[in-house]
């Protein structure tokens, strides 16, 4: 949950205040079925974290308690933590199931760009194949964006035009339904990509 870290810090800080001591907290890192553990083991004082490991990375933390300023607090970027959680979730899922490669659709849009970025971070760009499935509704700009993204990420691509499938399906539907609405034709492209 997005606010889990803040709730955890508050609970540990309250415990540290009650104990009048610094609390050492240890948490596992990685995915386990549908759960993703962020790690973030460290020392917590009554005002929050004093020092902790980065989230979603297996590592150790050496603490010089004599030099520790107990008034310092650790701040993190929420967006970076979400990205790290998604990356480790995908990486651990693949590792635990023995998967080494992924195939995903590249449309040139933001959704497929984010999925491709996370997959490349998680399992390596060389292990992610981006498939472009253009039809008459695919603009040159979208195709160019998808290819540019793949090149920048270092992932291979394959283009499989679906225009012939689209035309045949549209004609079959028009025989029984009459002329299709433009939005129906655009949605037909998306449905064909899912086949």
Locations of the language-model features?
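Phosphate/ATP-binding catalytic cores across multiple sugar-kinase/actin-like superfamilies
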Residues: 78-103
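Conserved helix-loop functional segments at active or binding sites
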Residues: 91-100, 121, 125-128, 171, ...
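Catalytic P-loop NTP-binding/switch module of NTPases
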Residues: 51, 58-85
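Short acidic, glycine/serine/threonine-rich loops at helix termini
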Residues: 2-6, 34-39, 113-118, 132, ...
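ATP-dependent adenylation/pyrophosphate-handling site
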Residues: 100-106, 110-147
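A conserved beta-strand->alpha-helix junction
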Residues: 57-64, 127-132, 136, 140-184, ...
